[in-house]
Amino acid sequence: MRALVYDCSAGISGDMNLAALIDLGADRENLERELSKLHVHGEWKLECRPAQQHGIRGTRIDVLTEEEGHSGSSHAHHHRTMADIRKLIETSALSNTVKRTALSIFTLLAEAEARVHGTTSEEVHFHEVGAVDSIIDIAGAAICLEMLRVDTVFTGPVELGSGTVTCQHGTMPVPAPATALLAKHFRATLNGTTHEATTPTGAAYIAALAQPVPSPLAGRITATGYGIGHRQGLPVPNILRVMLVETEEEETSPELLTELCANIDDMTPEQTAYLAEKLMEAGALDTWQESVCMKKGRLAVKVCALCQPEQTDRVREAFFRHSSTPGIRQHGMLRHILRRESAPVHTPHGTVHVKTSFMHGRPHYRKAEFEDCRILAEKTGLPLGQCQLMGLFPTSSHDNDATDSV
């Protein structure tokens, strides 16, 4: 399993996180190519350069925009709503995985800002998430996670800082109000620095994606990235360290999860499909529907969602908000997962990623990535099944049935 391990002892911000992921090995040219799919209004440029603090070499980034002429402030004053951000991401040509990751971060940030300002998450006008540089920071991080083939994200305690910070609403205490709300999702420390160590964007990223580092975490550190911040002359280095760890796994990896479910007989299929989307955006790992017959003989659906324990509150709230059910059943369960790897396979018509699961240290089951095969089929006009076979057997004639899964 490929895990990112965050050392946030000096805090985390959106620009430091993206810089650390680039320093870790995410391809910058490919990142900019993917980011261009967002069609953000106005010109922007990702400036990436080597930097040092306290003798440690790393990467520093700036997002140069047409509107601002520079970046570096995490409290930019460009107004957008969550509805604008959602439309920007959902209508882009980014992969579904990247869209889900980015939206999960933005959604958490929007919920925190909405609570601070006393409005709804879709209607809130908030400045940090609306700035072009923050859109690039969050969407860029989601793209980098996919490029680096990250399976899971871990973090140690996150330093929030102390003092005050100046934004459009005036001088605010550190942590900023939204950061303080987001900090309920992870273990935090205070007063380790005399500045704003963690921004709302950085807090939302950790809250949406990271789990506490297990003890012990066995594996090989295959790469380390350092994101260098813009603050100078601090007693504590303004640096974010991220390590890529190839973990040593058991044959199956047990994982404690929460299942939430409800029987619903008064929602349309369109409404339950929309509910499933909202559950995934709220942090569910999976959601599904089962046909059931209720006590008065009425046909209904049992809507279920599976999530990490720390995401339970958010998923349960989305369940109530977007469904007609007055009650939700909840219980814990263990999920056992075989070790899995994903690798690109080059075919005569393009690249297809193939997932392989392992038992007893040997390949057990292979499956061609559907989205890659779908894109290949649309580009070439070949049948989808043939494109799936090309991913599994790139040098075969693809005329015969295969034993691997397509």
UniProtKB/Swiss-Prot annotation:
Pfam families: Ni_insertion. GO terms for molecular function: lyase activity; nickel cation binding. Transmembrane segments: none annotated. Coiled coil: none annotated. It catalyses: Ni(II)-pyridinium-3,5-bisthiocarboxylate mononucleotide = pyridinium-3,5-bisthiocarboxylate mononucleotide + Ni(2+). InterPro entries: Ni_insertion (IPR002822). It comes from the Bacteria. Keywords: Lyase, Nickel. GO terms for biological process: protein maturation. Its EC number is 4.99.1.12. Involved in the biosynthesis of a nickel-pincer cofactor ((SCS)Ni(II) pincer complex). Binds Ni(2+), and functions in nickel delivery to pyridinium-3,5-bisthiocarboxylic acid mononucleotide (P2TMN), to form the mature cofactor. Is thus probably required for the activation of nickel-pincer cofactor-dependent enzymes. Belongs to the LarC family. This is Pyridinium-3,5-bisthiocarboxylic acid mononucleotide nickel insertion protein. The lineage of its organism: Bacteria, Pseudomonadati, Verrucomicrobiota, Verrucomicrobiia, Verrucomicrobiales. The gene is larC.
